[in-house]
């Protein structure tokens, strides 16, 4: 083995290998360059390492001759004529440029395009995802390019359902690098939102109208600037191809096609997602994005994913309601039994009064003449006392009202004894009904049947929520006729 130390470029160093050498170890500017050239060269492969870059190739018969000629000419010229020629300088410059292109601005090796190139060569599908948060906002995870356009980053964007799509467009524009227009001025790229159109009358691009417009312009301009007209036709052809790409046959509909349509930027995000939920995805198109990122497919969450936090909150509230419902059920049962005992006690008092009047009227010397005014006055006094009682408590004069009053009074005492706060109970019931109503609305959007008993977890919780809804619906029905009478 012969070691050569030279400051000449790679080609000159290779020419220094003579025909008789079996292998050569070449060191160039403190960089190890290994080249094994066994003679009589039975192998055709060689590998050169320069600044960490591996270059492989095939050695042909012509290369062998060039090595031989270079070696012989070097022996004839001598050491003083070993000056780098233009071809050698071009070779070194090309390798340096290749090495510089493989590093980004921060000096990190990006391996020829970074993750964008890797994803495109592997054929991976770059897609985003829409998630929900406990605060009932949407979290959009979308892959976007960095400023140097050599890498892809997952960007998380929090959006409110009542915000317009234009707000989401501005958020995406702030994360992507600007593009240059025809005048060389930088501007934010245009962002469009496309969703599947499930109606039968799909909106189709009228390509014939564009072609007719081009022909008319060409005729008016007198046939000049054919390149501009041809370019405009290519643009419309690209638009038509884009819409052809955003087209797929409907499931179970034979040859019928489903098309995607672009939504206005003034549409609320909640309405857009509600419509895109039927197709389970929508597309975000970014102007000037690298290959593979012009159309980002964003997966819309399913019903279970969309209502996950709502159902978890409902289950948590249901467990609290269940613990209170057990104690409340015992207190209510005791209160009802107490009210029944009060009613039976009132009947016993009336029966005892009837027996006294009978005894005093027919079995004593008082007789009917004395007992008649007594019974009349006692009955009238009882009626007047009851009337005053209903006026004082502002209640309707009925047995049901008196029974409810008795039950409620007994319930309050029992609740205080058991440590139940009615305000907490009512707030939990109202919140559970509100969450249930929201989940029902989302289920209607997704066209699914939601079994509320699985999340409410107990029949007593279901009955408590249903009872509260009935009370509210009954009060609303009673208030509506009153409002109508007031309007009249």
Curated annotation (Swiss-Prot):
Phenotype when changing residue 373 to A: Abolished calcium channel activity
GO cellular component, one term: mitochondrial inner membrane
Motif mapping: Selectivity filter: 368-376
Membrane topology, as annotated: Multi-pass membrane protein
Transit peptide: 1-74
Transmembrane segments: 340-361, 371-391
Activity modulation notes: Inhibited by ruthenium red or its derivative Ru360.
Residues on Mitochondrial matrix side: 75-339, 392-488
Effect on the protein upon substituting residue 369 to N: Slightly reduced calcium channel activity. Decreased inhibition by ruthenium red derivative Ru360
Record note on quaternary structure: Homotetramer, assembles in a dimer or dimers configuration with two interfaces.
Designated name of the protein: Calcium uniporter protein, mitochondrial
Provenance organism: Neosartorya fischeri (strain ATCC 1020 / DSM 3700 / CBS 544.65 / FGSC A1164 / JCM 1740 / NRRL 181 / WB 181) (Aspergillus fischerianus)
Lineage of the organism: Eukaryota, Fungi, Dikarya, Ascomycota, Pezizomycotina
């Amino acid at each position: 083995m012969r070691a050569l130390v030279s400051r000449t470029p790679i080609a000159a160093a290779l020419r220094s290998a003579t025909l008789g050498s079996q292998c050569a170890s070449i060191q160039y500017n403190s960089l190890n360059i290994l080249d094994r050239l066994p003679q009589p060269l039975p192998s055709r492969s060689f590998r050169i390492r320069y600044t960490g870059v591996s270059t492989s190739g095939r050695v042909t018969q012509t290369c062998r001759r060039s090595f031989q000629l270079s070696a012989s000419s070097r022996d004839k010229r001598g050491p003083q004529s070993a000056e780098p020629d233009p071809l050698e300088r071009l070779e070194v410059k090309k390798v340096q440029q290749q090495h510089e292109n493989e590093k980004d601005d921060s000096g990190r090796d990006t391996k020829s395009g970074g993750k964008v190139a890797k994803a495109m060569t592997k054929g991976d599908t770059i897609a985003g995802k829409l998630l929900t948060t406990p605060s009932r906002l949407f979290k959009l995870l979308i892959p976007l390019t960095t400023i140097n356009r050599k890498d892809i980053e997952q960007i998380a964007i929090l959006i409110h359902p009542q915000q317009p799509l234009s707000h989401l467009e501005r958020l995406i524009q702030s994360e992507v690098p600007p593009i240059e227009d025809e005048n060389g001025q930088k501007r934010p790229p245009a962002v469009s939102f496309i969703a599947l159109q499930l109606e039968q009358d799909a909106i189709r691009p009228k390509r014939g109208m564009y072609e007719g417009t081009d022909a008319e312009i060409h005729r008016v301009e007198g046939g000049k600037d054919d390149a501009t007209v041809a370019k405009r036709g290519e643009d419309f052809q690209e638009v038509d191809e884009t819409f052809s790409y955003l087209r797929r046959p409907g499931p179970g509909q034979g040859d019928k096609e489903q098309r995607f349509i672009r939504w206005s930027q003034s549409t609320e995000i909640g309405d857009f997602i509600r419509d895109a939920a039927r197709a389970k995805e929508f597309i975000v198109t970014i102007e000037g994005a690298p290959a593979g990122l012009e159309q980002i497919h964003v997966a819309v969450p399913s019903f279970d994913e969309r209502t996950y936090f709502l159902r978890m909150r409902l289950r948590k509230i249901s467990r609290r309601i269940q613990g209170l419902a057990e104690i409340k059920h015992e207190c209510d049962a005791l209160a009802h039994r107490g009210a029944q005992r009060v009613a039976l006690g009132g009947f016993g008092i009336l029966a005892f009064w009837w027996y006294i009047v009978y005894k005093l009227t027919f079995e004593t010397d008082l007789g009917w003449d004395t007992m008649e005014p007594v019974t009349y006055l006692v009955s009238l006094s009882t009626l007047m006392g009851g009337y005053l009682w209903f006026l004082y408590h502002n209640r309707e004069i009925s047995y049901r009202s008196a029974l409810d009053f008795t039950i409620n009074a007994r319930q309050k005492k029992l609740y205080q004894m058991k440590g139940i706060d009615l305000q907490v109970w009512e707030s939990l019931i109202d919140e559970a009904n509100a969450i249930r109503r929201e989940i029902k609305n989302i289920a209607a959007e997704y066209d699914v049947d939601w079994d509320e008993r699985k999340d409410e977890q107990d029949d007593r919780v279901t009955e408590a929520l249903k009872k509260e809804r009935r009370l509210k619906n009954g009060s609303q029905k009673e208030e509506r006729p009153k409002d109508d009478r007031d309007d009249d």
